Amino acid sequence: MENIHDLWERALKSMEKKVSKPSFETWLKQTKANSIEDSTIIITAPNEFARDWLEKHYDELISETIDDLTGVRLYPKFVIPTSQLDEPFVEQELKKPMKQPPAQNGEMPNNMLNDKYTFDTFVIGSGNRFAHAASLAVAEAPAKAYNPLFIYGGVGLGKTHLMHAIGHYVMDHNPNAKVVYLSSEKFTNEFINAIRDNKAVNFRNKYRNVDVLLIDDIQFLAGKEQTQEEFFHTFNALHEDNKQIVISSDRPPKEIPTLEDRLRSRFEWGLITDITPPDLETRIAILRKKAKAENLDIPNEVMLYIANQIDTNIRELEGALIRVVAYSSLINQDMNADLAAEALKDIIPNAKPRVLTITDIQKTVGEYFHVKLEDFKAKKRTKSVAFPRQIAMYLSRELTDASLPKIGSEFGGRDHTTVIHAHEKISKLLSTDQELQDKIQDISDKLRS
């Protein structure tokens, strides 16, 4: 018998390691497990929006996490708070669920592939292009292209995505293929249990009779001599039988401490490729693909802001997008760069200065001079519009990296010579007009605040 509150605390701690910090803080941290009914665990979400998002995106993660912790497959049902849910947690004995997930590949273990991780959903950029090409080559011709394929890189950069994509591709083109994905930690735990229960032969048969073995985070084998010994023989058996091995790590083989030299040398038999953090263009592409996949309408300025602020890895990037979407929905305000900055202030306390856009400048100048945004793009030449428009063009030239043609296009498709004229005119006036200097300074301060 296990207290459900304690179980959920353990589950949350486990899931915190599996998702980005923004995703955990936004969606999982505020949940509570209320009860267990047959094979269902009742989980309280803070509001309807969070409940709907959890149902769509986190039910499988929760089910797998509880299964890993207890050996019991429970299926989450999300509810919102009611007076009944405020009652104290009740201790319940975990019972075996009524329905079991279907077995895959006959007697083989569940391949544990994530349906969302395919080559189609992978965003290619300069930092992962080679790793993607190598992974696709391996998927198209297992054990004939590169064997083993060793992919390394930092957390959340797409190593696991590529491994799952290889598995999906192989099974799509050969449904009878025996494909297994697992972490080195799970390999270690199963090996220890097999030794304890005198089932070493079963363990060896399980992982030496596959067509493709995808093993994640191999660096965790470091220092585990017996497990390294077992994996060494598993590797040899598969390689000699012309079966594909794909390995991932957070560092190249030569930098994994206390890894046996014989394993290190075998990891170097095939191809070693790395993945580096995505550049700005790739980060924007990742956000656009995520938004499209989730049917979200995200303004370009929001995606640009997030991409400029989050340059570490894909998990944090997508987590930040989800947090902004949630924040916008919960406070019932349209998304813009300012709202994004507010939503992300807790996770990027030392945020980089927001990249100003021409639209930002037009809005601020328009508010200052009481000019409508559309008037900046119209053909109006009255002084009440033309002069603020010239100031906005001047500031766009001074405060952004936009080209002259780009600035002109943002002001109703005007020619770049018009932008040059506006910049020269305002620059000349500023040399003698103290009042204009004060106005420009005031507007600039508002833009930078």
Swiss-Prot record:
Pfam families: Bac_DnaA, Bac_DnaA_C, DnaA_N
Spans annotated as Domain IV, binds dsDNA: 329-449
GO MF term (any one): ATP hydrolysis activity
Segment forming the signal sequence: none
InterPro entries: AAA+_ATPase, Chromosome_initiator_DnaA, Chromosome_initiator_DnaA-like, Chromosome_initiator_DnaA_CS, DnaA_C, DnaA_dom, DnaA_N_dom, DnaA_N_sf
Annotated region described as Domain I, interacts with DnaA modulators, given as residue ranges: 1-72
Annotated ATP binding sites: G156, G158, K159, T160
Keywords from the named record: ATP-binding, Cytoplasm, DNA replication, DNA-binding, Lipid-binding, Nucleotide-binding
Region of interest: Domain III, AAA+ region: 112-328
One GO location term (cellular component): plasma membrane
Localisation per UniProt entry: Cytoplasm
Role of this protein: Plays an essential role in the initiation and regulation of chromosomal replication. ATP-DnaA binds to the origin of replication (oriC) to initiate formation of the DNA replication initiation complex once per cell cycle. Binds the DnaA box (a 9 base pair repeat at the origin) and separates the double-stranded (ds)DNA. Forms a right-handed helical filament on oriC DNA; dsDNA binds to the exterior of the filament while single-stranded (ss)DNA is stabiized in the filament's interior.
Record's protein name: Chromosomal replication initiator protein DnaA
Lineage of the organism: Bacteria, Bacillati, Bacillota, Bacilli, Bacillales
